[in-house]
UniProtKB/Swiss-Prot annotation:
Assembly notes: Part of the FGAM synthase complex composed of 1 PurL, 1 PurQ and 2 PurS subunits.
NCBIfam families: FGAM_synth_I, PRK03619.1
Domain (Glutamine amidotransferase type-1): residue spans on this chain: 3-225
Name of encoding gene: purQ
Disulfide bonds: none
Any one Gene Ontology molecular-function term assigned to this protein's record: phosphoribosylformylglycinamidine synthase activity
Family matches, as InterPro entries: Class_I_gatase-like, PRibForGlyAmidine_synth_PurQ
Protein name: Phosphoribosylformylglycinamidine synthase subunit PurQ
Chief location category: cytoplasm
GO cellular component entries: cytoplasm
Pathway, per record: Purine metabolism; IMP biosynthesis via de novo pathway; 5-amino-1-(5-phospho-D-ribosyl)imidazole from N(2)-formyl-N(1)-(5-phospho-D-ribosyl)glycinamide: step 1/2
UniProt GO BP: 'de novo' IMP biosynthetic process
UniProt entry tagged with the keyword Lyase: no
Active site per the UniProt annotation: 86, 194, 196
Amino acid sequence: MKFAVIVLPGSNCDIDMYHAVKDELGHEVEYVWHEETSLDGFDGVLIPGGFSYGDYLRCGAIARFANIMPAVKQAAAEGKPVLGVCNGFQILQELGLLPGAMRRNKDLKFICRPVELIVQNDETLFTASYEKGESITIPVAHGEGNFYCDDETLATLKENNQIAFTYGSNINGSVSDIAGVVNEKGNVLGMMPHPERAVDELLGSADGLKLFQSIVKNWRETHVTTA
């Protein structure tokens, strides 16, 4: 399986994402600069965290107009896995690939520490290696991770089982403790915590590795045939 790591001006987690796939997962991965226009040949798309374009206007607002974004939307439409982490999640919201919006954290402070997440849905291609209700530890690093949506959207997310992860303890004011959601098809995931920073016990947790393993497992089941 071959992954693309989208690199935007201000990305700062692209190296971590590359390391998770290449060194820990053992799969192909390439950096794709924001000025590119094609993602042909890639099986999965990863949009890392950071402060794309300085987070001017609002987080992800300018990144949505990058040359590469139509190709990201096309990959999602084709059913390829698309993962957006932190700023990547905000970008997916700006693209209209995921619902909701991000507000400033409730205490108006930047939060950077490991947090407990609860797996709410183990039936997506991103979470199949977890168990529903499983408690995992993944670090966060954000100032605007307060997930917000209206009551109607929240009801739809719950009805469609689109809430992938919630916080064990609500750290930022997110509606219903939401830390990550998928689209209706289940092939696009946005999450504020950083799984790519939790792929080795030396870093304090390897719980994030299961997410990447889930992606590969699903891809193998749907693309690899045995004689």
